[in-house]
Amino acid sequence: MLHFANSIITLYYMEFLNTFSPEKIVALEELNSKLLNKNPSPNNNIIFVYCPPKVGSTTLVSSIRLSAARKFTVIHIHDETLFSAISNNENMNKISVDDIILYNKSLGKNVYVIDIFRSPIERKISEFFEQVSALHFNNSEKNINLYNIDKVICRFNNLFPFLSNSDYFKERYGLSNIPETFNFEKKYLLCENNGVKYIKLRLKDAHLWGNILTEILGTPITIVNDYETDKKPLADLFNNFKNTYKVPDNFLESVKNCSSLAYYYNDVEREEYLNSWESKKIDIFNSYTHEEYVFYMKLCLENQSQNIIQVEHYIDIGCLCVACSTKRSKLLSKALRGEKITEKIIHSGAVNEIKHIIDNKNRIMQARVNRINELIQQRNARLNRPPASGTRLVKNNMKNIVIK
């Protein structure tokens, strides 16, 4: 049976080799190594959370890492921009996310790809606020937090039609076996193509993701909320926006005609959602034309002075060193008890915590040794004996504790 499985893997790999040039295969190997560099002990299970931004994916990534970091390697990616950020060749070989997914499958890995659907208006709002500082206003979050809310709403409405509403599951995965209707009983879709398992979730079911993923992945998954905009420096402005915003009538009509909303929400869910915005509807708004939007984006990108790519914004970045694993166990225990997770597992911080614990233990031990030596010296003095030789504390070697 094992021989048969190895033969299948070999066939996958040979077929993959025949698909690309030798130069591209080398580039794939290099890029894949960089993508997995957070995991010093690669396992045979890899999950690509490959979806649009602002759909709840950061929560999903951190939850899987926190629950099963040693069983699953998790790669979070929205598009090929990440490849250029971590590769010296700026993706000159035109490697796509699909290439990396199929490459890992050709290596014999169990590969999962996850996408998430989020209700359209909320997704557009979150996407806008994700780049409101670095792109749209090119100002610090602290200063933007003081902006007049009408100014921010006007900018958002001008951009509304152009803010993404893409569906990776249908548009990017190349699946030909997508069901005609969403599985409203199971609350997810699971399709397989080229040996890769593709999963579609809904953000509205986030409270059920733990059970859903436990069933699909075959290991317990606990969901922890991560990277919520209303807890960022822009929290005041964001919450004010959510409480103030009323959707223009022409925008709401476009949402009513949204095919993704009609597919991922059943009739009752869709009606409830639309009614929630119908009560907050205003007159039509004339947004930017396509030409105006193109000019706007060109100008914003030329003026941009901040880096949009974010680092270490997850609760768990997936490092498997002893220090990070120890911190992970503590946070997972909190999550299982239903406690809110407010800390992050960042390697340098986890290492410092371990060092702090060891230093405290060393200080306590040294104090005890000093006290024992003091008592011995007092006893020897009473008995007129020569002083005992001091005891030296051998400090712990941190190389045995963490991977630096």
Model-derived segments and their meaning:
Residues M1-Y13:
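N-terminal amphipathic/basic-hydrophobic helices that include classical n-h-c signal peptides
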Residues Y12-K404:
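Membrane-interface amphipathic segments in extracytoplasmic regions
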